[in-house]
Amino acid sequence: MRIYSAKLKNFRGYHEETQIDFNDLTVIVGKNDIGKSTILEALDIFFNDGKGCIKPDNEDLNFDARIGGEDTFSISVEFSDLPKEIVIDSDACTTLESEYLLNINKRLEIKKTYSENGKLKATYIVAEHPSNENCSNLLTNKITDLRKILQNFNIECDNKATSNIIRKSIWNYFSKDLKLKTCDIPVDKEDAKKIWSGIYKILPTFVLFQSDRQNKDGDAEVQDPLKEATKRILRNEELQKELEDISEKVRTELKKVADATVNKLKRIDPAIANILKPEIPESTDLKWAEVFKSVSITGDEIPINKRGSGVRRLILLSFFMAEADRKNSDRGDNNDIIYGFEEPETSQHSDNQRILITAFKEISKDRNKQVILTTHSGDILMQLDFENIIMLSGDKKKKITSIEPDQLCYKSLNEIDYIAFDNPTSAYHDELYSHLESKELIGGYLNTIRQKDYIEKNKYTGEPMPVRKIGLSKYIRHQIHYSDNEYNEHYTNQELRESIDLMRKYISKEKSN
């Protein structure tokens, strides 16, 4: 299963319902505090019910929603690549489609609502479902109620012992009058709990790697995988027998020492000696795992917390992925895994950033893996296809847009920086201007934009030349390349942005002609 999309409503900065679409590899970009991490944390809450990195609380309800009298927020996730069959009633196999549990796009959509204090309020499946009152609540009905419907309408059914077969018979009977419509089907009450239990088993495992962590070898995330590995190793039957033999040998030797001590004491104070006896724990009472409580990974005898921050983060990130695989394996259902990485470039040299994104791209190609990350790194974005990048913008009204190949005929870091991070730079201005020159479009373009007074510096005398009008973009271009000319006011950031936008629009117009 893959996350196809997610919807947030009344959650933190997301007041109006906002939909985010995902690919096998999705990179979310945008300004600081725009809500990128909120998307990852919403997924953590949805999948892990507060038992992952994020615990929902009363500050998660959107401020405007609270002021407006609303007291719930919702997180919805839409899944694609669904299993062909699913078990939701005892051991009987059925399909999500035949149970009318798919939305209008033939995908599985699950919505969870939370109260203002952050507690899970209800779980729904949003689906195109029968609304005919005679067959609209079959999923929540007990099997005895389903049999009554068979009886009341004289509906034939081959197997009255299996709920999903009874439901299918009833829906077939009303097939010409199902009145399908999109509705929220509650799956956390009545017999629908069985349905949710079956669906929950096939959901992907989601794990979140956050950026703000200390990355020490004493951290719980580092210690836990090794501690769990220690416990699993020590549970091995053969090893248990060896430990018991060791324990018995130690007990025997300790008893000799203790008995000799008591015998000596009898010669000094028999009364005290007679009430003393050695207390030596049994092998089963020994906490063998505690012997290995300080396990860690070192290199050249240097522990993680003495390494550089970049290396610490790489090691911890590797722990994180190994732990995610282990947790998924422990579920026993061979589920898909979704990795969420928050700003993986933190503390990493640009070379390491490129190595990381290459690794993420390879991971996302695995049949059962999906990768979602946030970034501020142009180096990472340069390694991606445009289809992998989505941009988050807007303040109170969030806007999600994809980044498309744009005005230049090659992938430009400066252009990506401008589109993704809204960062106008003189370098990008230079690229656009040079592109217009190379296409012999610069003359026509400069005649279409506003003109600005410019004083040229005489290259021989250094004296100012007469004032003349030139296009805004040429004015900025001259200031970039002739910075020693002090006779003109420096262009403003607003003018730089204006000029970039004008050149982009002109290039786009010429492309379409």
Task: Give residue ranges: language-model regions.
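Beta-strand elements of well-folded, non-transmembrane domains
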Residues: 26, 79-83, 114-118
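Switch/connector loops and helix/strand junctions flanking conserved nucleotide-binding motifs
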Residues: 83-89, 119-123, 217-220, 381-383, ...
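Extended helical coiled-coil dimerization/tether regions that scaffold
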Residues: 186-192, 198-207, 211-339, 471-475
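RecA-like P-loop NTPase motor core
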Residues: 361-367, 378-513
